[in-house]
Amino acid sequence: MRGSVYYQTGQLTEAIFVEGAKKEDRIDPDHLHYKCMASYKSMKTYRDVWNNLGNYLKEHWKLKDFEKINEEHIDAYISYKIEYYPSKQYLEKIVSALGKLEDALKRFALIQYGAERDYDFSIRQNKLHYAKVQKLVANGYHNRVYQNPVQIIENLSNDHHKVAALIQLYGGARSEGVTLIKKDQLKGIAIDPITKEEVGIIETKEKGGKIGDVMIRPYVYEWLEEYFQYDERFKINYQAYADDIRQTCLRLGIEPHGTHGFRWTFAQNRVRIYQDHGYTYEQALQGVSWEMKHFRASITEHYLGG
């Protein structure tokens, strides 16, 4: 499918929206209107989500064709939304909209090509369930910054988890940037352009193929260098890592914010570092956004409660 994001979601809306379609027909597998939508309000709500998804995929995955969306893209998009600690209702709306997108793509293919294409976005329900169980959704805005992150890290039960958390805390990496690190990702010691202090550089490739440098404390970098003398890969299990953080927080009487809490803490601390070195608030937001592999400065503001 070609055209702008808005044009493509319009085409999909035409495929799935039937004004006046009866409810009994929309739930009848043998009816022409099966799984169609008839509410203008709901259709607009879902299309807004589709537009947001399309812009996300265009920015992060360089994907411009809705017909090429697959399960991996849906997984990444929901993970991206969970980063910002959404409300339960908002995440449920996104998941419902993505389910209807699957239906719309199938109907569009049937109309255009005479046969349905195989789309399966069922992972969205698993992501929603996981987010609820792990308390990654909120009833409103909730700051996920750790007040004493070092205490948490020092008390983690696994040394590899400690290293991963330190990289997230001091480098702002996403979880997928620390669960697997290869030897050739180490790029040496450099100078932090803001503080003018020495830092270790790790090149990470995160969801969507975004490649960029993560700056970490020299002692963490040296630990990795020594580790790679004996192993080609530093690898941890994400679920075990997240569980270790959660159990450690509960044991210490600290509210757990998951692995991403370290990334939130990095954002807040890094903005302050920029300002301490003479940068304006707006310059700090943009600089930190780039370091966190975002383009828009406004995204960093979310981590600060803005």
Give, region by region, the residue ranges found by the protein language model.
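Basic, Lys/Arg- and aromatic-enriched nucleic-acid-binding interface segment
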Residues: 144-175, 282
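N-terminal DNA-binding module of tyrosine recombinases/phage integrases
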Residues: 1-40
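DNA breakage-rejoining catalytic core of tyrosine-based enzymes
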Residues: 127-150, 208-219
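Conserved tyrosine-mediated DNA breakage-rejoining catalytic core shared by Y-recombinases
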Residues: 180-220
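A short, glycine-centered helix-capping/turn motif at helix boundaries
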Residues: 167-180, 273-274, 292-294
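C-terminal catalytic core of tyrosine-transesterase DNA break-rejoin enzymes
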Residues: 265-298, 302
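N-terminal core-binding DNA-recognition domain of tyrosine recombinases/integrases
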Residues: 26-131
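Active-site/catalytic core of tyrosine-dependent DNA strand-transfer enzymes
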Residues: 215-271
